[in-house]
């Protein structure tokens, strides 16, 4: 995150500044150094659909297709 010194006992950076503004900008909060969860979920969902489609394709072609 940032090099700010925290006054909280567990070392967290406060969520809001005293005037009510967010302590960390929204854009950097969601895109700083990590993959967004929606991107991971989309890739995982596409992989699941691909594998299930492969099983359905295999049931009509090759062994087990009658």
Curated annotation (Swiss-Prot):
Gene: psbJ
Assembly, per entry: PSII is composed of 1 copy each of membrane proteins PsbA, PsbB, PsbC, PsbD, PsbE, PsbF, PsbH, PsbI, PsbJ, PsbK, PsbL, PsbM, PsbT, PsbX, PsbY, PsbZ, Psb30/Ycf12, peripheral proteins PsbO, CyanoQ (PsbQ), PsbU, PsbV and a large number of cofactors. It forms dimeric complexes.
Recorded topology in the membrane: Single-pass membrane protein
Location(s), subcellular: Cellular thylakoid membrane
Glycosyltransferase listed as a keyword: no
Protein name: Photosystem II reaction center protein J
Alphabetized InterPro entries for the sequence: PSII_PsbJ, PSII_PsbJ_sf
Family (UniProt): Belongs to the PsbJ family.
PANTHER family attached to this UniProt entry: PHOTOSYSTEM II REACTION CENTER PROTEIN J
Gene3D superfamilies: 6.10.250.2070
Chief place where the protein resides: membrane
Species of provenance: Synechococcus sp. (strain CC9311)
Residues spanning the membrane: 37-57
Keyword Membrane annotated: yes
Record's function text: One of the components of the core complex of photosystem II (PSII). PSII is a light-driven water:plastoquinone oxidoreductase that uses light energy to abstract electrons from H(2)O, generating O(2) and a proton gradient subsequently used for ATP formation. It consists of a core antenna complex that captures photons, and an electron transfer chain that converts photonic excitation into a charge separation.
HAMAP family named in the record: PSII_PsbJ
